[in-house]
Amino acid sequence: MLYMEKAKEKWCAALAVFVCGFMAHGYFFTNKISYHDDSCYYFGVGMTFGSGRWALGLIQKVMNKVGFLNYSSSWWNGGLCILLTAVCAVLLVELLQIRQKSYAVLLGALLIAFPAMASLFAYMFTAPYYMFAVLLMIVAVYTAVRYPYGYLPAIVIIAFSMGIYQTYFGVATSLFVLILLRDMEDRSFAQNVMEAFKYLFTLLGGMLLYFLCNRVCIKIFQITLVEYQGINNMANVTMRSLIGSVKRAYLGFFQPIFQDLCGISSHRTIRFLSLIHISEPTRLALIS
């Protein structure tokens, strides 16, 4: 009976993804809209090994071997993304232990209607591959959290996901932090520290394995990494560069309060609302 109740919440999340997905992105699916790279890669997956996306390159080679032609189809690729997002929602309901149908629906709706999804669909030629990378990150976290030695396969899964698209490393990181915060009160301080180090080890292990596989693929396929966004220097990390990255992150976070950010906060009202939005968590923390 309890399993059936949990299944209902998962079905609610998945259904919310399908309904809200087609409502929010139906215009993309019923029209062919190309931005930037999508205009150039109708029949490809874009930069692979040269951008450090060795897993995407390997997937493309396998697809070519079996005769599968990649095409930037709005309906096919968009539908695959909706399906993959629904699977993500189901896993997140279980992972975050959501026990109310309304919250499950909200999770599914937010997951598919988030602005990053609209950006993803702008590059429809590679959208399902990138969504698959998101799913892999969630699977990695689920495996590491649910099973005693799950961090070992999780390391491999994280590395492969980063090999498709490096950006989604933040998905695993954020989920680990959320789970630590959720379980903090139910464990002792020592147990919390042990769990934190296990998750940190999993993340670092996945990143190191990604770089190792990237180096191997570069050697095998005789590829040179491109300079775009500093990809050719992504493994050259120093303490100074880390401090600089943290500084830029905080400056970028608070920038909408003080000045315009890409046209988003050009009006004073928007800046004031940004200030309220940023300061609200601090106020709630002080009250509690």
Q: At which residue positions do the language-model features occur?
A:
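Perimembrane helix-loop-helix junctions
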Residues: 171-204
